[in-house]
Design a protein with these regions (language model features):
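Extended acidic/polar regulatory tracts at the flanks of large eukaryotic scaffold/adaptor proteins
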Residues: 1-152
Length: 152
């Protein structure tokens, strides 16, 4: 519960430019924020992704802080490949489609907020290496299955 309250406080502070600038200038805090994506609680994971996305779209400093935070996440969680946890969230059968949608929104923000073409290519290559194309195809099939269940 404390974790949720802290995320709510961070979210409130990001409602203005001063709060965004303050957080973007503190990559160590952004790294801790990213670790919340490793939570078992879907709400906490979603909140963490939303806050990281706000930082990414604000500008270069926030974007670099989020990339560093994702590298920190990889290191702390012992992942072999950067962004593996994002792929894992898309591939798991336990997560619902709404959460997977939020993960995809974060991934799109990550790719589209890159500062230059080389960085965008590198991020896309990392995501493709993790198996994102298979995950997206699987997600499309799940979406169709859910739609068909609701229609029938």
């Amino acid at each position: 519960q404390l974790q949720v309250e802290l995320l709510k406080c961070l979210k409130a502070s990001l409602n203005n430019q001063l709060g965004i600038d303050f957080l973007a200038a503190r990559p160590e805090v952004v790294g801790i924020l990213a670790l919340n994506f490793g939570s078992e609680d879907v709400f906490i994971c979603t909140q963490a992704l939303e806050l990281l996305a706000v930082l990414m779209v604000d500008g270069p400093e926030g974007y670099r802080a989020v990339l560093a935070a994702m590298d920190y996440f990889k290191l702390v969680k012992g992942e072999r490949v950067r962004f593996y946890s994002l792929l894992d969230a898309l591939m798991t059968d336990e997560a619902d489609l709404a959460f997977k949608r939020d993960v995809m929104l974060f991934i799109n923000t990550l790719v589209n907020s890159a500062m230059d073409i080389e960085e965008r290519i590198e991020i896309r290559a990392d995501l493709i290496y993790t198996g994102i194309l298979d995950a997206v195809e699987r997600l499309k099939n799940q979406s169709v299955d859910v739609f068909m269940e609701k229609v029938s």
